[in-house]
Each structure stands twice: as structure tokens, then as C-alpha cells.
Amino acid sequence: MIKKKLLFLGMIVPMFLLPANAAAQHPHDGHYRPDTTALSRTQHLGEVVVRGKYVDRVNRSAYNAVAIDTRKLRNTNLDLAHALDRVAGIKIREEGSVGSAVQLNLNGFTGQHVKVFIDSMPMDNSNTSFGLNNIPAGFASQLQVYKGVVPVTFGGDAIGGVINIVTDHSPRTYVDASYSYGSFNTHRSNIALGWTGKRGFLVRFNAYQNYSDNDYKVKTQWTDLTNSTISNEEGWFRRFHDRYHNEAVMLQTGLINKSWANKLLFGLRYTHEYAQVQNANLMKIVFGGKLRKNWGLSPSLLYEKRNLFTRGLNLSLSARYDYTVTNNIDTLSRTYSWTGQWIPKASQGEGATSLAEFTGKTLTAVANLTYRIGDKHFFTLNETYINFHRHTTDNSANRAMTSAATFMRRINIKNITGLSYQFIPNNEWNAIAFVKYYDTHVTGPVNVSETTRAQYEEQQRNSQALGYGAAGTWTPGHDLQVKLSYEHAMRLPTERELFGDGDYEEGDAVLKPEKSNNVNLNFNYEHTFADAHTLVAELGLNYRNIQDYIIRTINAKGVAVSTNHGHVLGQGVDAAVH
């Protein structure tokens, strides 16, 4: 399979090395990026101005994309998740308050079907402290939202869309800071500093923190400690063990606008998180002493060079190494009720006894090459490599855990190659065709027992697959645009789905990738009246046919597990008027 892939690349790469005289000159080709800036129209969402910053050709591309200019949100307490919640077609669902899990819904696609990137680099396996609902909106200069088919520049396995966080590398000097206080003793603050010298030396510093007691009221069933039964009715109770705080510090420095590099930036990010765990995946199962702690360190590198060797050939290289340490602590010999009262428990641990320490190591590397031939032909080649390792490092603390799977290796390696061709014959229509090659290697514990008693052994599984698709757009009039796209894509299982979280999320290392056929049809109408008022109407139809759909279920003990469900058929309609 490796030989086949090398042959595949060997046929593709020469296409990008055509002689310079094969490409017509264009005054803007040194700054042209056909895949990553396809951002359409202007929208006003509250105080957020959504603007398309694009080359005219890209504006007429088949990608359905919008952008939020988050510079309007500097010095506010808004986070990236709630900034996205203002975009038509996006819904944000939080499991609780500050520090809780966040799920994105983008035109009917949810969870892992929608991927998040920072500067076109996947955020897979980043520390949970560095999540959309923790990062201040001012951290980004722009949020790009791609719905449906996405450019191969985003080399992940998204089948529902992509959210790309674009950070600020502009040559300017600034200081931004904010602090806010809210309900439930919530404190949020952030600071951003930037300086660029006359010779292109750049320094960027960002830091933020979030804190909350999260002692709001919830309606749930509760445990009667006199007979250890759970009530049939529900009552209102105040959360008493849900304190959360996290901190992050980011430093980036390097050079911009040099003859040998448009960008060469080195970065370092430190994150820390402390979270009390109030309940299991089922709210009726409550805890009073369980908690989770983690910290992470992430060095990174970004290199960009436009007009490499020949005019119109642009190269981008980025890499990041994520090192995270997580502690799941559950040692109290107690059984709690939602009233805050408790009774002694014969065994240690409110759930499963744990002092476990897990170490995760992830290497992410992305190479992107674009080439323009004349004014009508555009090629993009992308290679994305993600190597994840996780192991338990504290053996003595886990003596109470009897599972042999505890100390087995957990490895997930993903290699995705994408190639696209865009044809722009005129201003009325254009089309894009693309192909993706997926190569995955998974190593982890597998339950091989045929009885109720678990028996684990370490197994390895390799899989390869091919994805492909096409998209086109037609502009029959000045105000109307029609977009049609089809994609046969893969959604690879995440590390959490494969290996769990070592606590109340159980993994399944033999999960198969989802295989999906998606069709999207969009109508966009925009008309400006008297150069002062703009009416925008959008109608979107989507169809998806998914095989081996990965579904998350929760058992009676509050433990979640992901399994391949089978066949899922989905159809949707979304409409918006601005």
C-alpha cells in the first residue's frame, strides 16, 4: 500500500513543477489562495460584521463559506463558540456552563462530523482547556465557516463542514485586554500583545483564564440515601461540586515578508485545567469528590512561501506537537445525593477507583502546495499526518484497576492526501473536482472474550480508502447564485471513540470509519437597494447517506461507548433571510 501511495504522489507532484512560462502572469498571483479564502457576502450579526475578504475568482467558487470578523469582538467577554452561534446554520449546544463540553451543529451535521482548525491546521487532540468555549473571541482575527464540501487544503476527515480559526499575523503593534465578572462567581480575563519591527520581526503574546463555581440549579432525579434508590420524580437542586478553572499562555515569534519566506513563525502554548466532576453522563448519578486535572505543552512551526521557484506556486508547511498529561481522581469512599448529603461506601471510589495519569503525545504535520496555470486552472495538493500515542504512566496508582487493558498501548496514525482541480472559464460558472486518500493505523486493546467476562489483547488494524467529489456553481443573474456539490467521504474514528477517556467514556479500538455520500444544493440571493440596504436570502437542501455510522450510547451506570450503528439516511432544509 505504501508503494501504491508513492506511485500516486509521483504522478501528481510533477503537475506542480511545470515551467514558469506555462503560467500566464497575473498581478495578484503572489497572494492568491484559491482554497482558503472563499468567503462570501456581507452579513450583520448583532455587532459582528461578517465580511468576505477574497479575490473575485474565489468569490464565485463552489464553496459555501462565510466569515466572522472577530476584531469587532476584542475587549469583550465573548468566546469563539458564542461568536459562531451568531452564524446562520450553526447551533452551539453546551452541556453546562463554563468548562462544559460543546457540540457544534452545522446544517444538521454534529459532533465529529464538523472539524475545527487553527490557521488551516487541525485541532485534533489539543488540550480540552483550549476549546472553542474557552478561547476568547479576540484570539482570532477571523472565523471561517465552510458548510458542506470543504477545500482539500483542510486535510482532515470532515464530512459536514469546517470551522477555521484565523489568527492575526498582520504587521502591527497592539495591546488588548479585558476582564468580566458574571453569575455563579464567574471570572473571565484575557490579554493580547503584538509587536512587529521594521525588518519583519514579529512577536505575539496571548493569555487567558476562565473560572466559575458553576453552582446553578438543575432539575433531575436524586438518590434516596435511606434505601439507596433513585426517585421516579424530579426536583431542583443546586450543583455543589462543579468548580472549574483553566489557563492558557501562548507565545509566537518569527519573521514575515522576507524574500525567502512570507512567514516563518515559531510558537509555544501552555494550558492548564482543573475540573470538579459533578455527575456522570447520566445526571442522576452524582459525585461529591471526583475531579479531573490536566496540563499541556504545544510547540509549533509555520512556514509559508509564495511564488516558490516559479510564479504562482505557493507552499505552506506547519507542524505542532501536543504533549498532555491528564489525571482522573476518584478515591472517596462515599455515595452522594443531589442534596449534598452522603453515606459511607464499603469500597473506595464513588464510581471506579482511580488515581490514573494518562500521557498523550500527538504530532500533527500539514503540507499544502497550490499552483495556478493561467487564469482558469488551479491545482491544490495537501498532505496531513497525525500521529497519536497515549499510555498510562502511573502504575502504582492503578493497582485497584484489574483490567489488563489499562496499560496497553493506544496508537492512532492518520495520513490523508488530497488533490483538487478548479476550473474557472468565466464569471458565470466554475467547477471543482477533488480526490482524497485515507490511510489509518490503529493499535489498542480489544475485548476478545465470548462471555460476559472481559478478556483484552492488544491488536493492530490498518485500513485504506478513497474519497472523491465535485462541486459547481452557476450565476444566472447578478443577484442569484446556485451551488451543487457531491462528496463520497470518510469520517475516521477519533481517539476518544477508539480509546475512551480513561473515566466514563469507554473506547472501542475496532470501530470502522464512517462512509458517507453527501449531496448539497444551495440557492443564494443578494440584492442591494439604493447602495444602502442589502437583502440576503439563502436556501439549502442536503442529503446524506452514511454507512457504519458511529453512535454514542450511555448505559445504566452512566458510561458512554461508541459503536458502529449501521445505515443512516438524513435529509435537511435550512433557510435564512438577512
Model regions and ranges:
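Periplasmic-side early beta-strands and strand-to-turn transitions of outer-membrane beta-barrels
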Residues: 180, 198-283
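Face-selective signature of the C-terminal outer-membrane beta-barrel domain
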Residues: 252-273, 292-452, 457-458, 462-481, ...
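Short acidic/polar hinge/loop motifs at secondary-structure boundaries
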Residues: 113, 121-147
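Outer membrane beta-barrel strand-and-loop segments of large Gram-negative receptors
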Residues: 414-418, 511-512, 518, 526-578
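N-terminal periplasmic accessory domains that precede
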Residues: 47, 80-83, 100-105, 130-133, ...
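Outer-membrane beta-barrel translocator domains and adjoining extracellular loop/strand segments
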Residues: 192, 216-224, 276-285, 327-336, ...
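Short, acidic, small-residue-rich periplasmic hinge/interaction motif at the N-terminus
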Residues: 26-72, 81, 540
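Extracytoplasmic beta-strand/coil segments of soluble accessory domains associated
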Residues: 81-122
